[in-house]
Amino acid sequence: MNQIEKTGELTSSRFTVRDFTELVKIGIVNSNTITAFTGMWLAFQLNGISFIQNVDVIFFTIVGSALIVAASGAFNNVIDRDIDGIMERTKNRPTMTGKISGKRALMVALVLGVVGTIMLFMTTWQAGVLGVIGVFLYVVVYSLYAKRKLVSNTVIGSFSGAVPPLIGWFAVEPSFSIVPIMLFLVMFCWQPPHFYAIAIKRKEEYAAAGIPMLPVVKGIERTKKSMFFWVILLTVLPFFMFDLGLVYVILATLLNIGWLALSIYGFKMDDSIKWAKWMFVYSLNYMTILFVAMVVISIFL
């Protein structure tokens, strides 16, 4: 490992758009922004609130959510510089190649976090507080502590990943109902099987980096059982979401049955890595279809 990989020292003043998107983990930003949008959209649709007359709320919610998620990703990159160089999938992050120094990455994270939080508070104080809680859970509780110390790190990290749809809902309708609670639970239960699939594929890398992921500590078979458990929990949730109509409940149930069948097949399949890839791909398609369906179906309610 060279000096750049160890410290992330800046070797070039060039800071490209690609470097920025890698720093903030743009894929995670996009997916979380979609869930925040869905929460916001459903709050408009199910509460009879005008979408057109609240363009400012839409703007502040979407951009604010994207910025705090981006800030969290940048903070995580700064924190993980000591282990990113060990793992194949993270060794080319700009904080490791020297394109972005740790100091600059930290400044970017702080600016994004502050601006994003201010924007969320410009919708409702509930949305702003949820944004702060989400960043704290991901950066402090997960990245600084749980990820490195606890085998339950993935489950703990799922709390922060389930916050964006709550932000979207409470930015529009600052009161509790069953829908935002179910959105939170869908995101919370979806993340363990999704990230455990990655952990199975990257088991040796996590072991080398000293990260106590479930497959590393308890083994792949134990991880398969845990993934099966979380998918079972997902199968229950649609039956608490009849506010979105029977079509949604049927669609979500069919998606859950498919994922459940794939989970069960994993106990019979010898090639666990190949199975984990299938689980990972299914999880991505599952979340995309589910949240797009929520938006589309709600239009006709």
Swiss-Prot record:
Reactions catalysed, as given in the entry: heme b + (2E,6E)-farnesyl diphosphate + H2O = Fe(II)-heme o + diphosphate
UniProt membrane topology term: Multi-pass membrane protein
Predominant cellular place of this UniProt entry's protein: membrane
Keywords: Cell membrane, Heme biosynthesis, Membrane, Transferase, Transmembrane, Transmembrane helix
Entry-linked InterPro entries: Protohaem_IX_farnesylTrfase, UbiA_prenyltransferase, UbiA_prenylTrfase_CS, UbiA_sf
Transmembrane segments: 20-42, 55-75, 105-125, 126-146, 150-172, 176-198, 227-247, 249-269, 280-300
UniProt KW Lipid biosynthesis keyword: no
Cited function: Converts heme B (protoheme IX) to heme O by substitution of the vinyl group on carbon 2 of heme B porphyrin ring with a hydroxyethyl farnesyl side group.
PANTHER family on file: PROTOHEME IX FARNESYLTRANSFERASE, MITOCHONDRIAL
Known partners and oligomeric status: Interacts with CtaA.
Protein name: Protoheme IX farnesyltransferase
Species in which this protein is naturally found: Listeria innocua serovar 6a (strain ATCC BAA-680 / CLIP 11262)
Gene behind the chain: ctaB
